């Protein structure tokens, strides 16, 4: 049981005692004693609080002169009369003599105080600038700069004081004279005003500047005369250059800057350095990444890197789609350009890349033209270094003994000391008959790299219908499809294949023999009639085009087998029993003649079929296309 926060425990209050009234007087006395004690404590606390409130009210009455009604009074007590205490003496600013000053609004007073504060700060800045300008051990340049800083500080102070005077005059306040600084920068002992001092400093600065400029023009300066200098002679910054001169030196933006061109000795230098280098920096095309074989000692022939990126091209068939063209080997050559110099630069950049087996595929092919018209020859290269200097395939001086080497199917590589380089330039001796390029991709379909168009003469117009073949490859001997003599050599002994290499020879246009006069008339003959063929009249379907890709891979595998030493010697390709006659007598004779000129004397057998390719030979697969209907 709880009574005003007090608990009555069981010993003091029990049910039988409450019921029967046996202990009632004792319980009542205890409860009354507790309540009285509590009342006495509360009364004491209340009296203390009332005394505090009384003091506060009396203090308020002394300030206001009136006793507040909240002041506690004893019963029957009258309100006390309290006299107002006089106010304490406080330090107030002296009243301004002008009565208009008391009528300023708070905004005007704040603006006036801010302007006066700014003037005071600027006075301190001017005094510090004067002390720095008068410091000893200063050379001419430092003294001139500090004088200039002092003049600027004084000019700013003069402007602020003018603003303060105008503002006070507008408010009707008396204009105050500028207070003198401790160092006497504004008003010195003689009473020189600010304007006079500012004019003197400006005149001194002009005189000092003219003296320094005259000394710099005559070749002398204050820095050479005084021992204390800001910068040593070797560390002083160079004078600023004109903007036009800076643009002429820097070349402007990187897009307009002329590309860096290495000297000819670096471009046509050592074959080893060219083998490990990327494309020439003057090449507008992208450089090809180097294969991993260059870091392995080239024990295994490098895999040709085929790019599908876009870039300038020298020749591209018109009817061939750009995506299909970008996948071919000739996509690394580029489109034709009207400028012969740009064609030569692009061709050189494309042929100075990694010298792999794909470099042998970079032959001059058709540019723009009709379906049957042979492509126009490229512009003759200008005089200069040879355009094509491959380190593996093409050489200007082959060995006279035709034999198979470890890298090409043509003549063996000349020794490294005999190869053309910048250290030992090639001497122009008696003209020799150079051999044709080796390492042809024999099963690469010819219709991929030939132009297609709507107009012009095709095979159907140049050959009889039974002799028109289907989609064939170079392995079938169709390099000599058109009748005519073997490759025509120029008077100086240069080959049509290597004509673009020699800068001193001009491209010789020859008419293909064996054609009718009306077919020959008006045709632009390719520089190499042996490698050019009109396109087939039948476009192979998608399935055969996929087979042509397999044939291209087969040619690459043949190249690997020949160069890795797996093939002991040339073997004759076996004839399958179910295959009929391969070629007509005309085609057989021409193929034999071309094979003899390309791969050696008749005693040697043609190139072997790939050992890793399980399909029948190409001649067997396309045997029906060569037979007379």
Curated annotation (Swiss-Prot):
Localisation per UniProt entry: Cytoplasm, Cytoskeleton, Microtubule organizing center, Centrosome, Centriole; Cytoplasm; Cell projection, Neuron projection; Cell projection, Growth cone
Keywords, ordered alphabetically: Cell projection, Coiled coil, Cytoplasm, Cytoskeleton, Developmental protein, Endosome, Methylation, Phosphoprotein, Ubl conjugation
Coiled coil: 109-173
Biased composition (Low complexity): 209-219, 279-294, 418-432
Claim: Plastid is one of the keywords in the record: no
Post-translational modification as stated in the protein's UniProt record: Ubiquitinated; interaction with CYTH2 may prevent ubiquitination.
Composition bias type Polar residues, residue spans: 323-332
GO biological process: microtubule anchoring at centrosome; protein localization
SS bonds (residue pairs): none
Location of region: Involved in CYTH2-binding: 31-70
Primary site of residence: cytoplasm
Stored Pfam families: CUPID
Residues with Phosphoserine modification: 355, 357
A GO cellular-component term linked to this record: endosome
Segments for region (Disordered): 209-356, 399-432, 602-629
General function of this protein: Centriolar protein required for centriole subdistal appendage assembly and microtubule anchoring in interphase cells. Together with CCDC68, cooperate with subdistal appendage components ODF2, NIN and CEP170 for hierarchical subdistal appendage assembly. Recruits NIN and CEP170 to centrosomes. Also required for neurite growth. Localizes CYTH2 to vesicles to allow its transport along neurites, and subsequent ARF6 activation and neurite growth.
Complex formation: Interacts with NIN and CEP170; leading to recruit them to centrosomes. Interacts with CYTH2; this interaction is direct and stabilizes CCDC120, possibly by preventing ubiquitination.
Protein name: Coiled-coil domain-containing protein 120
Species lineage: Eukaryota, Metazoa, Chordata, Craniata, Vertebrata
